[in-house]
UniProtKB/Swiss-Prot annotation:
Pfam families: NAD_binding_11 (PF14833), NAD_binding_2 (PF03446). Its EC number is 1.1.1.387. NAD-dependent L-serine dehydrogenase that catalyzes the oxidation of L-serine and methyl-L-serine and is possibly involved in serine catabolism. Has low activity toward beta-hydroxyisobutyrate. It comes from the Bacteria. NCBIfam families: HIBADH. The active site is at K171. The keyword Membrane does not apply. It comes from Pseudomonas aeruginosa (strain ATCC 15692 / DSM 22644 / CIP 104116 / JCM 14847 / LMG 12228 / 1C / PRS 101 / PAO1). This is NAD-dependent L-serine dehydrogenase. NAD(+) binds at residues 2-31, 65-66, 96, 246.
Length: 298
């Protein structure tokens, strides 16, 4: 049975690690938050004293951290993990980071004889808990096949996006589109209600018409339209607005690097930055509804 080092047990990492335990894998886990470690230990994992300790004897290293600087620090610092992971180890980096950062870590890992994949995920905390995540994978196809059983223990859809960094490119493209669709849905909902339509009726009309999209299907931003959506619990839980702003920033970095025109992505980033200034950083990203009707969700 493979020994897995899992580093980063936040809202996404913890349920992903739990599903690996359920699949029978042996886990050595580390997080800076002790309560997160304790929860995994209670589920059957072993606790490491440090990230460096976690990777000792590991066949696979999985990391799930907040941002590029954390991931680069973990692997590339003077005493970073790449200096302590045994050659031949498979490294799965599942955080959402800049494609340039992913490529930098890929190159450093390859120099040390490590097989690495950038494998950001989509599906949110619910998908992480249910084991239905989508993995967007960048890197060597042979390494992906070795990692496939692990991905299948945590997710439902596994896509090989392309070479080093391609998983991260796919992720920022997806999340930019998600933000634009959510903003458009929120704007349309506010317009219709302001002109006398009942919110649930309007939502159903649009859902079944050419404007239909994921937000209208399962994540409507108008409170009360969908009982289980974050909008109906004061925008708590879900995918925080500050994380969407981070991902939109990564998309803009990629756009600048490739001289791509992304006016909608740029506007979306401006709107989410405005939400952060208004104090909604830790609310679900569907809280963008408040920019179009500030009375909603109060």
């Amino acid at each position: 049975m493979k020994q897995i080092a899992f580093i980063g047990l936040g809202h996404m990492g913890a349920p992903m690690a739990t599903n690996l335990l359920k699949a029978g894998y042996l886990l050595n886990v580390f997080d800076l938050v002790q309560s997160a470690v304790d929860g995994l230990v209670a589920a059957g994992a072993s606790a490491a004293r440090s990230a460096r300790d976690a990777v000792q004897g590991a066949d696979v290293v999985i990391s799930m951290l907040p941002a590029s600087q954390h991931v680069e620090g973990l692997y590339l610092d003077d005493d970073g993990l790449l200096a302590h992971i045994a050659p031949g180890t498979l490294v799965l980096e599942c955080s959402t980071i800049a494609p340039t950062s992913a490529r930098k870590i890929h190159a450093a890992a390859r120099e040390r004889g490590l097989a690495m994949l950038d494998a950001p995920v989509s599906g949110g905390t619910a998908g992480a808990a249910a084991g239905t995540l989508t993995f967007m994978v960048g890197g060597d196809a042979e390494a992906l096949e070795k990692a496939r059983p692990l991905f299948e223990a945590m997710g439902r859809n596994i896509f090989h996006a392309g070479p080093d960094g391609a998983g991260q490119v796919a992720k920022v493209c997806n999340n930019q589109l998600l933000a634009v669709l959510m903003i458009g849905t929120a704007e349309a909902m506010a317009l219709g209600v302001a002109n006398g339509l009942e919110a649930k009726v309007l939502a159903e009309i649009m859902r079944r018409s050419s404007g239909g999209n994921w937000a209208l299907e399962v994540y409507n931003p108008w409170p009360g339209v969908m009982e289980n959506a974050p909008a109906s619990r004061d925008y708590s839980g879900g995918f925080m607005a500050q994380l969407m702003a981070k991902d939109l920033g990564l998309a803009q970095e990629a756009a600048q690097a490739s001289a791509s025109s992304t006016p909608m992505g740029s506007l979306a980033l401006s709107l989410y930055r405005l939400l952060l200034k208004q104090g909604y950083a830790e609310r679900d990203f569907s809280v963008v509804q408040k920019l179009f009707d500030p009375t909603q969700g109060q």
